[in-house]
C-alpha cells in the first residue's frame, strides 16, 4: 500500500485537495487503523494461508474451531460500507479498489471446499453468529461485493446460508442471526424461510422491548452492550429488507430507527473525555465494537438533532486513538490479542477467541459516508462528556416512551 496515502488524500495526479479541511487527518487515521486491523485477515485469506498464519488464543480451546470464520466475518461486516463506496479517482478510492479485490478473492477461498481456508460452513452452533455477520456484510456491500462475485461463488454462498437452517438459535439475540440470514436470502434469491425471518423480530417487538430504546436480550434482562453490538443494528438492516418486500413486520422500521436514534445518543454520552467507557457486561473484548449502533446511526444519518455528526466523529476518533494508536492490542505478529486495552485474557468469556476480537471493526461503518459528508467535513466538536467536564453547555438527557 502506498505510504503517500497517509500524508493527504490527493487526486492521483494533482496537488493536495482542500488541505484546510480538518476531516483529512481524522479520516486518514480511521483508514490507517482499518488497514492495521483488517489487512492481515484479508490478505492471508486471499492467499489461502489464514489457518496457517493466524494467531490463535482462547479462554476455552473449543472456541478456536471457528476463530478463522469469526475473524473474517467480523472484518467484512465492519468494512463493507466503506467497500460499497467503490473506487474513485482519489488515493483512498484507489485503496478501496484494492480492498474490494482482496475481499472478493478472500470470499471465493472461504466458500471453496477445496481451499485450505474453506471456513464459511456450518461447523457448529456457534458458527451461526459468524455466518449471520457475513450475511449482513453482503447486504451492506451488495453493489461492490455481491454483484461482483462469480455465479459459482454466489451459489456456494446461498448453499451455505441455507445450511444454517439446521441450527436452532437460542431465545435471545441469536434469533436475529437467523432473521439476518433469511433477509439476505430474500434479497439475493427472492425466497426465504418466512418463519425464521420474522420470529425473532416479533419477539423483540412484542415481548422484549423494555422502554427508552432498550431491549432485553431474551426473557431476562442483563446489563451489557448487546443492544449496540447486535440487537439494534441487526433489527435495522433486517427491517429494511422486510419493508422492501412488503412483509408485515417491516412496519416496525420507522419506530425502530427512532429507537436507534435515542440509543445512539445514550452511547455518545458514555464516551469519557479520555475516550474510555464503562465496562459493563459481556464481550468487552470486542473493544470499540461496542459502539456498533452509534456508528450505524451515523451512517444512516439518524443521529438526534441535538448531536452533531462531527461530535460523534470526534468522540469515536478518541476511542480509536485510545485503543489502536499504539500496538498494545496486537501480538508480535500483528494479530489482535485478547483484552480491552492490552493483553487481558481474564476479561474474556469462554466463547471468545482471537477471531471474536475483530468485532471491533464495526466502528468503521461511517467510512461508508463520502469524505465530503458533514460527518467528516465539519470541524472537531466536543462530545457530551467533554463539554460537561469542561464546564460548557450541555442539554438535559431526554428519554422516549415509544
Which residues does each PLM region occupy?
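Beta-strand-rich domains and repeat architectures in extracellular enzymes and scaffolds
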Residues: 64-77
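Aromatic-lined, polymer-binding surfaces characteristic
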Residues: 68, 79-81, 96-257, 269-295, ...
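Terminal, non-catalytic domain-edge segments
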Residues: 3-59, 64, 81, 85, ...
